[in-house]
Amino acid sequence: MRIIFMGTPMFALPSLEKINEKHEVISVFTKADKPNARGKKINYSPIKEVALANNLKIYQPENFKDEALIEEIRNMQPDLIVVVAYGKILPKEIIDIPKYGVINLHSSLLPRFRGAAPINAAIINGDKKSGVSIMYVEEELDAGAVILQEETEITDEETFLSLHDRLKDLGADLLLKAIELIEKDEVEVKVKKQHKN
């Protein structure tokens, strides 16, 4: 499958690496480079580092308002766009381009903890379980139909980092399963529409 990958932080790394092993990643979109605290050195996102190491074409747009960029994405003829912690909301013009749509890995069991910081929210709220959700992307944030979910227990000793690391690996594996279902036209939507908690 021809895939455009969109992601930025460490959480997205296993997903890009695993997808790149099994599919054709035609380009990677990540947030713009930022200067470090002293402003002397430019820091690349973890996703950009991996994309560079794998000779993948990289885009770092500030937004998706440039018609030339939208046309360039159309010309790539992606089968699918995969989003993992990208940090930008995609407009309908982008969502409508890929043959099989756009899917997103979210680090909670939707509809619980839509939006930002779901890992923190699960720990702060004392949840006994968390997990990952793969869903279709719509214009509304974290509102698309859920394709797959996988749960994991939250222990009393759980930290943000331990749960983050477990979910990023669970999510990468679940993404591959979702892509396979999409490829075989075997997707059975689990939840038709997400609602706010």
Language model: regions and residue ranges:
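Short alpha-helical
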Residues: 10-11, 68, 89, 141
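N-terminal beta-loop-helix "entrance" segment that forms/cooperates
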Residues: 34-54
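Donor/substrate-binding cores of folate-linked one-carbon enzymes
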Residues: 80, 84-197
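N-terminal Rossmann-like dinucleotide-binding module
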Residues: 1-39
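Internal alpha/beta domain cores that form substrate/cofactor-binding pockets in large enzymes
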Residues: 2-4, 26-29, 57-76, 81, ...
